[in-house]
Amino acid sequence: MWYVMQVRTGTEENIRCLCQRLISSNVLERCFIPYYQQKKRFQGEWHIQERILFPGYVFLIAQNLECLVNGLKKVIGLTKLIGIGDQIVPLVQEEVELLMRIGTDKQLVEMSSGIIENDRVRILSGPLMGMEGNIRRIDRHKRIAYLEIEMFGRTVEMKVGLEIIRKE
C-alpha cells in the first residue's frame, strides 16, 4: 500500500533519509519523493533541473500500517499521514497508477515536448502524452505545464516540464 506523509516544505529529503534509517526495511518497503524535470536557462545555456513534484509530501510504501505508524513515531519533523478525518488511508489504485505512468520506477517525471495547434496542446513525446485534458495552463517562458489531477482525495495542481516546440 502507498501512503503519503505531510512534512514541512523544504525538509522532504531529510525526512526521507530519517525514515530509511530509523524504520526497518521489513516494515517500510520504500520511501521516496517524486521529482519532475524542468529546463532553466542560466550562463547562456539550457540546463535540466530536478524539482519536487509535490512539495511538502513524502511517499511511503508499506504493507502493515500499524507497524509503519509505530516506526514513524521515531521520525522527528513528521506533520501527519494523509487520510480522511482521523482515518489513515492509502492512495487509491488510480493515483498509484498515475504516479507510476508519469514517473516510472525512478519517480522522475521527465520533460515532455509538444506543439500548439489551433490553441490546443498536442503532446508529441514524454509522460504527458494522453494527458492533454488535464493541462490547465502552460508557461512557455519557464517551460512548465500546470495540470489538475485528483490526488490525496482532492484536486491538486501539479507542475511538470513541457517544452512547446512550435505554435501553429
Locations of regions flagged by a protein language model:
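Acidic-enriched and Gly/Ser
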Residues: 1-120, 148-168
